[in-house]
Amino acid sequence: MIIPVRCFTCGKPLGHLYAVFKQRVLAGEHPGKVLDDLGLVRYCCRRTLMAHVEWIDDVLIYEKR
């Protein structure tokens, strides 16, 4: 739900890269190339960004009022 700030496995900071990654992928670039350009070579870091799903908008409709 919340963007990953650090890689869950190795602890590398990723929060500052997520907005760039998302913007470039939505623009049509291949995710693998974007991750290469961002300098993410470890598969654990790549997995953390690629597997993230933003569910916050879906969850907010169930907010207790």
Swiss-Prot record:
UniProt-annotated binding residues for Zn(2+): 7, 10, 44-45
InterPro entries: RNA_pol_su_RPB10, RNA_pol_suN_Zn-BS, RPABC5/Rpb10
Cofactor note: Binds 1 zinc ion.
GO molecular function annotations of the record: DNA binding; DNA-directed RNA polymerase activity; zinc ion binding
Known catalytic reactions: RNA(n) + a ribonucleoside 5'-triphosphate = RNA(n+1) + diphosphate
Subcellular location: Cytoplasm
Superkingdom in the source lineage: Archaea
Free-text function comment from the UniProt entry: DNA-dependent RNA polymerase (RNAP) catalyzes the transcription of DNA into RNA using the four ribonucleoside triphosphates as substrates.
Subunit relationships: Part of the RNA polymerase complex.
Record protein name field: DNA-directed RNA polymerase subunit Rpo10
